[in-house]
């Protein structure tokens, strides 16, 4: 438990590295190297469900990119240390990433407790969506590269899609 708390503290302190750092094959790059946290290591537990660190990292990266794009579109310089209500922009994106991570774990818990599982129709819809996305990206290799930029691969994308 102490190791998890230490890892979480380290991960949260390295947010800006995740928001602007270099990349590896899955898009996490410097953040994972600096934190030393394995992608599959349980980062937190939500109502008994262990949540791997890659999920938090995905939502953190997505939040950073979304905020970066909003500032770019508005023609504003992005300062992660800029004060906002409750802290800084970096604090805001960390809080949102944690909230999204917890939300998805909560939905999974609810689905499990109510016996909701993906059926053949759901899986067929996911396959059709995959085909559409790969075509939109110019092929599967290009789509897989785009997913890697988000810290995902096909299995992880399908895992998140199956929840949402």
Model segments located where?
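P-loop NTPase catalytic cores that bind/hydrolyze ATP
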Residues: 101
């Amino acid at each position: 438990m102490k190791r998890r708390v230490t890892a979480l503290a380290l991960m949260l302190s390295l947010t800006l590295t995740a928001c602007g750092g270099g990349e590896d094959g899955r898009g996490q790059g410097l953040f994972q190297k600096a934190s030393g946290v394995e992608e599959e290591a349980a980062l937190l537990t939500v109502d008994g469900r262990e949540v791997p660190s890659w999920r938090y990292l995905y939502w953190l990266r997505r939040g950073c990119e979304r905020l970066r794009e909003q500032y770019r579109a508005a023609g504003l310089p992005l300062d992660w240390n800029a004060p906002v209500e409750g802290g800084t922009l970096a604090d805001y994106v960390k809080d949102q990433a944690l909230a999204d991570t917890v939300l998805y774990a909560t939905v999974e818990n609810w689905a499990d407790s109510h016996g909701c599982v993906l059926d053949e129709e759901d899986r067929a819809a996911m396959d059709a969506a995959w085909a559409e996305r790969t075509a939109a990206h110019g092929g599967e290799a290009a789509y897989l590269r785009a997913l890697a930029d988000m810290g995902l691969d096909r299995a992880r994308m399908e895992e998140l899609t199956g929840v949402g």
